[in-house]
Amino acid sequence: MKLMTMPSEFQKALPILTKIKEAGYEAYFVGGSVRDVLLGRPIHDVDIATSSYPEETKAIFNRTVDVGIEHGTVLVLENGGEYEITTFRTEDVYVDYRRPSQVSFVRSLEEDLKRRDFTVNALALDENGQVIDKFRGLIDLKQKRLRAVGKAEERFEEDALRIMRGFRFAASLDFDIEATTFEAMRSHSPLLEKISVERSFTEFDKLLMAPHWRKGISAMIACQAYDYLPGLKQQEAGLNHLIVSLKDNFTFSDHHQAWAYVMISLAIEDPKSFLKAWKTSNDFQRYVTKLIALYRIRQERSFEKLDIYQYGKKMASLVEDLRKAQSLSVDMDHINTLDQALVIHDKHDIVLNGSHLIKDFGMKPGPQLGLMLEKVELAIVEGRLDNDFTTIEAFVREELAT
């Protein structure tokens, strides 16, 4: 198969391939970018594979950076762009089902492609637009099928994260997993416990943000892979609820909303501990935990002005999106009205602060000062007090007198 027109991302990188070939080596576009252009999808990263060894690659170009030279990768800075160029390689026995004990550089494109995970990711493209397909990836691409390169069992024993990648590709590409590949994923799912939580989180996160995320979750359920992921053991019922409880065309607006609804579906009682088990950042934990709290408030009643002040309009909108996807009542106009009615959106918007209370009223730093500031803040939010210096002073004077 030959591309009639090279996409602009590849055209810009063609001089790189030309230089390498002029130096006497082979060079091809490889991986996800080739797959995506054949599917008519946007291209993100342009990866280049070559028969030149790293030191040979560095000798061809003036500006290079060793970003992963032990694995054969050199970053080339050329024509205003950055390109990762990786030497054809084979990989020895894998350690702990996640990393090769040794990487060997080779001159053969086919040897390089056979170590890749799925046939649709094992395609290469030359400078003339000719697709090199050694493992029937084009047929799988046409039939929207995800199939492991070579023996599926070996691919997943080499790197068990490929199981999670399989779920993610099913979700992002809307592909079905080929039967033999699926069975190997199912039988090797226990190996996911060997994978770093951070790597599993990245794949699960991408799955949740994919347009066909239900397909990825369904495959995970069918493989019983969830039993080997943090906080998901024996959570088949919760994961099924996650799939069926939202409208078919619903996709998550952002990562916070996605993980919040996962925990809502699983009825997780301690969201922070759940997210800690996934080794997420403290900021992520705080935001998602607040989002779940606001969701539960909304399940009980309509939003009030104080809710919008404390949680924010954006977070309230994420909650309403989830309610709409469940065919529950929503009222974005009410949220907008409450937000517009807020005199302040943050305590720093208040014209008077703790320093003023210390200076003008002789208050001392401590709990009493903090409590007074909270009273001022609440009174302004609820509309009982104007955000005016003189008015606030009078309010404080009255509070201190009682």
Curated annotation (Swiss-Prot):
Note: A single active site specifically recognizes both ATP and CTP and is responsible for their addition.
Protein name: CCA-adding enzyme
Gene3D superfamilies membership: 1.10.110.30, 1.10.246.80, 1.20.58.560, Beta Polymerase, domain 2
Entries under InterPro entries matching the protein: Bact_CCA-adding_enz_type3_sf (IPR050264), CCA-adding_enz_C (IPR032810), CCA-adding_enz_firmicutes (IPR023068), NT_sf (IPR043519), PolA_pol_head_dom (IPR002646), PolyA_RNA-bd (IPR032828)
Lineage: Bacteria, Bacillati, Bacillota, Bacilli, Lactobacillales
HAMAP family: CCA_bact_type3
PANTHER family, per the entry: CCA TRNA NUCLEOTIDYLTRANSFERASE 1, MITOCHONDRIAL
Cofactor: Mg(2+)
Task performed by this protein: Catalyzes the addition and repair of the essential 3'-terminal CCA sequence in tRNAs without using a nucleic acid template. Adds these three nucleotides in the order of C, C, and A to the tRNA nucleotide-73, using CTP and ATP as substrates and producing inorganic pyrophosphate. tRNA 3'-terminal CCA addition is required both for tRNA processing and repair. Also involved in tRNA surveillance by mediating tandem CCA addition to generate a CCACCA at the 3' terminus of unstable tRNAs. While stable tRNAs receive only 3'-terminal CCA, unstable tRNAs are marked with CCACCA and rapidly degraded.
CDD domains noted in UniProt: NT_ClassII-CCAase
Native organism: Streptococcus pyogenes serotype M2 (strain MGAS10270)
Record-listed ATP binding positions: 32, 35, 116, 159, 162, 165, 168
EC nos: 2.7.7.72
Keyword Transferase assigned: yes
Keywords: ATP-binding, Magnesium, Metal-binding, Nucleotide-binding, Nucleotidyltransferase, RNA repair, RNA-binding, Transferase, tRNA processing
Enzyme class: transferase
Amino-acid positions noted as binding CTP in the UniProt annotation, renumbered to this chain: 32, 35, 116, 159, 162, 165, 168
Gene Ontology biological process terms, A to Z: RNA repair; tRNA 3'-terminal CCA addition
Catalytically driven reaction(s): a tRNA precursor + 2 CTP + ATP = a tRNA with a 3' CCA end + 3 diphosphate; a tRNA with a 3' CCA end + 2 CTP + ATP = a tRNA with a 3' CCACCA end + 3 diphosphate
Residues binding Mg(2+), per UniProt: 45, 47
